[in-house]
């Protein structure tokens, strides 16, 4: 569904929070322009917003809205036609010997926050003073516009949490919010 089709009817206009700009996390030296909506107003059409390229952060939904760039792409994996490659099967078979997974409600813990901080410091070179505290972790990953439909996909090995995915369960899709 195209953004123009979703925006008709006034609901999205009521949810409109504005545009923001930041350094593009995907293309060095570029600026990203984002369109923000209040997720509380659009929860019941969130699946359609995903189809239009929106993502979620806490209680807000957003999408890249750059005027001169269209490089950000939504990745969809149609599960009914997806077939693992030989390499994917090999990695899967090795992984199930080492890791266990659990799906649980999204909740805060110091262990999860520390795992996210480790990821951000390593993967994004985020300085210590910018790393999330409990409040920012909760706002971004736990307190959402989707309530109990936001879940955690936990990855464990030897009794230690080593990976965490925050996912939104929708009627026809799972949407990954963040994985670290």
Give the predicted meaning of each segment.
Residues 1-107:
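Terminal substrate-recognition subdomain of acyl/acetyltransferases
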Residues 57-68, 74-180:
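A conserved beta-strand-loop-helix scaffold within acyl/acetyltransferase catalytic domains
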